[in-house]
Amino acid sequence: GGLGGRSANDIAKTTDLAIAIGTKLSDFTTGSWSNFENPNFRLICVNAARFDANKHLAQPVISDAKLGMEKISELLGNWKSNNAWIELARESYKKWNEYIDQQIAPTNQELPSYAQAIGAVYKHADPTDIAVTAAGGLVGEVLQVWRPKSLNTYETEWGFSCMGYEIAGALGIKMAKPDQEVIVFCGDGS
């Protein structure tokens, strides 16, 4: 969708099945469904909330995410996607990362772009540093540029337009994880 990477959006065009796990499938993430062009496209939604599992003509799986995926894996048995599809995904992801590397590279312009500023911070961040963002155009930039170096090190809020969340959110994260650095990106909406 609008906040996603080109690689995921490109793959979505030809995919025949997507499994949405614990997501509300908002327009931000789906591109208002314009990305799914395959006429045979099917959707499975794994969600603990019945309302969110029953969206977009999906096959709902009303379940805890982990338990639901364990059951789906069990039902799939030894089935695997074909190698051509996996290679297409890898190549697309590689191209996406090359694109991001170009966007964050220094240039001779007077002021750095959002991507360049975020990239500079990212380059110097430790693997345990936590990035937080929430409002304005900066959210999309951070989402695309920041590639978490370890689990649970990226926090964003954009689905409910809670301008200023990143400030309170960062304080709460720092209280919960005092030994980790918290990096806050304040957007133009805060």
Residue ranges and their predicted role:
Residues G1, N9-T14, A53-N54, I62, ...:
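Thiamine diphosphate
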Residues G2-A89:
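Glycine-rich, acidic loop regions that bind phosphate or pyrophosphate groups
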Residues D16-A18, R42-L43, T128-A131, E181-I183:
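Beta-sheet entry/capping signal
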Residues A20-G22, V46, V132-G136, E157, ...:
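Generic beta-strand/beta-sheet core signal
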Residues A48-F51, I100, E181:
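Generic signal for short, ordered secondary-structure residues
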Residues Y93-D179:
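Active-site diphosphate/adenylate-binding microenvironment
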